[in-house]
Amino acid sequence: VCRYITELIERGEIEKNSRFRGVQTAKIARLKAEAKCPVVGEIACGVPLLAEENIESYITLSREYLGSGKFFILRAKGNSMINAGISDGDLVVVKQQETAEEGQIVVALIDNEATLKRYYLDNRHKRIRLHPENDKMEDMFYETISIQGVAVKVIKDLQ
């Protein structure tokens, strides 16, 4: 029995449980891994709004759901990202990082104000284009911005 258990552990199908003498499937262990994400205020989905640095609360999410990295949560304010499925009041889960690929939705810090927009490089004019996902709004152009993170999930209240 010991040889079979060792073989299953080596293949990554089960994991030893350190709390007691037992094992659990690797999938259950991944589902149990959690990340405590701070809710740090509102983010403008329209005109940039000062992002609050104070932590309002924490939401615990599964690592299986998030993946690896450091995360924080902002509450969407406004309607500039409605075509991306982000509405006023939604919680946006953001992976904290300083770079982004074109087309990703980023939290951009501009003159100490944060906004949530789709990120593009305008190489011809050597500037950054932040695109609101709302046909009634126009793109915003900047020489420099500070990327605070990339939006990875949206938590909606359906009621």
Where do the protein language model's features map onto the residues?
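Acidic/glycine-rich C-terminal interaction modules and beta/coil loop segments
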Residues: 65-159
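Short, cationic-aromatic polyanion-contact patches
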Residues: 19-36
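Active-site/binding-pocket entry motifs
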Residues: 29, 43-49, 136, 153, ...
